[in-house]
């Protein structure tokens, strides 16, 4: 599960950097924060693996919610990275509007999905774990962008 999530974050990050013309200090710091969350991800993943199906439902919920919040923050930071690059005009001038819109729309749904799955996890932790994996698999699917 963690591997798929890290892979999805890496693919999203790679898609963003493909469109960058340059970077500034703020973008680099946002990037470092994203790297910090990726490095932190094994901790909540371990909590899920240790406490789901092993302990009380309350402990399961805490572990799954903590994992989901980590994923939500990671997805929000990835989206913020992209929106910051757009807002500060760090994106290549030859990037087409269709490409920019597609990537923006591709990065945004994960946020809403994570919020819904976190809420589901409060009642059905195992279903939430499956949901987190499904979101990661969705983001592992190729982005279809037509280059001009």
Positions of PLM-derived features:
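Multi-pass alpha-helical transmembrane bundle typical of ion/small-solute transporters
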Residues: 1-148
């Amino acid at each position: 599960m963690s591997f798929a999530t890290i892979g999805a974050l890496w693919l999203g990050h790679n898609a963003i950097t493909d469109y960058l013309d340059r970077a500034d200090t703020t973008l680099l710091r946002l990037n470092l924060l994203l790297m910090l969350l990726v490095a932190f991800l094994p901790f909540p993943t371990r909590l899920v693996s240790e406490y789901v199906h092993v302990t009380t439902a309350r402990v399961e919920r805490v572990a799954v919610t903590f994992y989901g919040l980590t994923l939500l923050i990671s997805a929000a930071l990835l989206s913020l990275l992209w929106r910051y690059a757009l807002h500060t005009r760090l994106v290549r001038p030859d990037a087409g509007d269709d490409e920019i819109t597609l990537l923006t729309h591709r990065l945004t749904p994960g946020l809403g999905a994570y919020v819904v799955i976190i809420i589901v996890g409060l009642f059905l932790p195992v279903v939430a774990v499956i949901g987190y994996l499904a979101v990661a698999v969705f983001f592992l699917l190729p982005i279809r962008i037509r280059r001009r």
